């Protein structure tokens, strides 16, 4: 497993700012933003640094997406809080950030016969006419891994990098248990 690589592709977090927001004022201070209350009840705000998108609601709740690290989420929230403070927004307490989903891409550095994998691997689906990968569901930690014949994987649903690694370890354990991992010469 030492040669397996995982890379964060996206992190989604929900945030509570513990403040009520006047979205008409907020839209004026958010660069690269869009607000059309007839279509959507929040502001869609994009930051270039860190490169994320935020959905900002009058309740003071946010959804942050597009982040490549938890630090990016914290930086984006801090940046927004600083901007909101300048227009007189009062906060009940420090923002609360809750990671909802992390998406990783990876490479197991080996190829797989997905028909063979689907025959023996529990908790998986494989419909090659509809999707070219095996969908493997891990219950604990909760995650879904897409496994392709090239050995490339996508892991989603994890709430931390540790959870993603644990899910990948479980997949590798199952693949090994059923004799689906070729030993390198």
UniProtKB/Swiss-Prot annotation:
InterPro entries: TBP, TBP_archaea, TBP_CS, TBP_dom_sf. The gene is tbp. This is TATA-box-binding protein. General factor that plays a role in the activation of archaeal genes transcribed by RNA polymerase. Binds specifically to the TATA box promoter element which lies close to the position of transcription initiation. It comes from the Archaea. HAMAP family: TATA_bind_prot_arch. Signal peptide: none annotated. Keywords: DNA-binding, Repeat, Transcription, Transcription regulation. Transmembrane segments: none annotated. SUPFAM superfamilies: TATA-box binding protein-like. Sequence repeats lie at residues 8-84, 99-175.
